[in-house]
From Swiss-Prot:
Job of this protein: Removes 5-oxoproline from various penultimate amino acid residues except L-proline.
Protein name per the record: Pyrrolidone-carboxylate peptidase
Subcellular location: Cytoplasm
GO BP of this protein: proteolysis
Species whose genome carries this gene: Clostridium botulinum (strain Eklund 17B / Type B)
EC number(s) given by UniProt: 3.4.19.3
Protein family: Belongs to the peptidase C15 family.
InterPro entries, per database record: Peptidase_C15, Peptidase_C15-like, Peptidase_C15-like_sf, PGP-I_bact-type, PGPEP1_Cys_AS, PGPEP1_Glu_AS
Enzyme class: hydrolase
Keyword Transport: no
GO molecular function, one term: pyroglutamyl-peptidase activity
Gene that produces this protein: pcp
Catalytic activity, reaction form: Release of an N-terminal pyroglutamyl group from a polypeptide, the second amino acid generally not being Pro
Length: 213
């Protein structure tokens, strides 16, 4: 089994992206699955082009993209991606799409095909803060999650795919009062446990991970 796991380069004025750094720290094998690590640009469309190049090159069974979500307290597997690009800031090539569809012929939304509740359970049992998220935003993270699930729906039905957001690391919040963070070691361990859950669970577990509002 092969797992392709991607991490974005730094964006938004940050000098580091914990998503990419945590991906780099992952072992090369998890639960007997080969781990293929890929850096992708925080750029609309180019990020998806690079992912598809690597789908064709490596033919992964599982594809997990990792992104930074500053302000979150834990590691948050995403439930759903929506068919909209609405960028509050420019990407790394100064693109700023507003109210545009990711793919014109795509569904309004796609749900992850990863066992996200099993992933959360693995992390929580290891003492790592984690919860299911119901919004991947409308920037490049959602763009990538939606695009990957679109490609799975249209062309690569045998791949399981989805997205995980991670918090800032401590060095990023030195001048951000009251902003939560998590050590890169805990983030990487959480991702390792998430991959383990994805490899070992063909279907998700049934446990309450919803929100009131």
């Amino acid at each position: 089994m092969k797992v392709l796991i991607t991490g974005f380069d730094p964006f938004g004025g940050e000098s580091i992206n914990p998503a990419l750094e945590a991906v780099k720290k992952l072992p090369n094998t998890i639960s007997n699955a080969e781990i293929i690590k890929l850096e992708i640009p925080t750029v609309f469309k180019k990020s998806l082009d690079k992912i598809e190049e690597n789908i064709l090159a490596h033919k992964p069974d599982i594809l997990i993209s990792i992104g930074q979500a500053g302000g979150r307290f834990g590691i948050t597997p995403e439930r759903v991606a929506i068919n909209i690009d609405d960028a509050r800031i420019q990407d790394n090539e100064k693109n700023q799409p507003i109210d545009l569809k990711v793919f014109e012929d795509g569904e309004n939304a796609y749900f992850t095909t990863l066992p996200i509740k099993a992933m959360v359970k693995e992390m929580q049992e290891a003492g790592i803060p984690s919860s299911v998220s119901n919004s991947a935003g409308t920037f490049v993270c959602n763009h990538v999650m939606y695009g990957v699930l679109y490609m799975i729906n249209k062309k690569y039905p045998n791949i399981k795919g989805g997205f995980i957001h991670v918090p800032y690391i401590p060095s990023q919040v030195v001048n951000k009062p009251n902003m939560p963070s998590m050590s890169i070691e805990d983030i990487s361990k959480g991702l390792e446990l998430s991959v383990k859950a994805a490899v070992e669970n063909n279907t998700d577990i049934k446990t309450a991970q919803g929100e009131i509002c």
